[in-house]
Amino acid sequence: MKEVTEFLKKAGAFYLGTVDGDQPEIRPIGVFQEYDGRLFTAVGQHKKVYAQIMKNPKIVICAMSENRWIRVRAKAVPAEQAIVDRVFADNPFLHTIYNDQSGLKLGVLELTEGEVEFCSMMGPERTEKL
């Protein structure tokens, strides 16, 4: 799964898709981590995206870099506190947003029960299970 994390970091911008009722929604996100072969992302619990994921945990993450792209389809489930602590340690800027003073909480989500599709402009190259 390190390949997924490296691809997303190289791409710079990547996008998280959810469903709001019967309407698809997509937005850029910036936090994506891999720990011990497990994939995680994070969003603010005060945001619509978090409520959408709690209602329907099926998500997609997509990014493009150098005429190749990646699509991660998964179920996003809340991560255990030890992972939340690691995400904060590895992304110190999050403390400026999510802290006791702001009252905002970060929702760290593990990506499970999914697959990663590696593609080029010619079509899918390969698919791997999470």
Kindly give the residue locations of the regions a language model identified.
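A short, Trp-centered hydrophobic/proline-enriched beta-strand micro-motif
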Residues: 6-20, 59-62
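Acidic-histidine catalytic/liganding microenvironments
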Residues: 11, 56, 91
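Residue-level signal for well-ordered, solvent-exposed loop/turn and beta-edge residues enriched
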Residues: 23-25, 75
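Conserved beta-strand in the GNAT
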Residues: 28-30
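A short mixed-secondary-structure module that forms the rim of ligand-binding clefts
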Residues: 32-67
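Charged, gly/pro-rich active-site loop segments
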Residues: 71-130
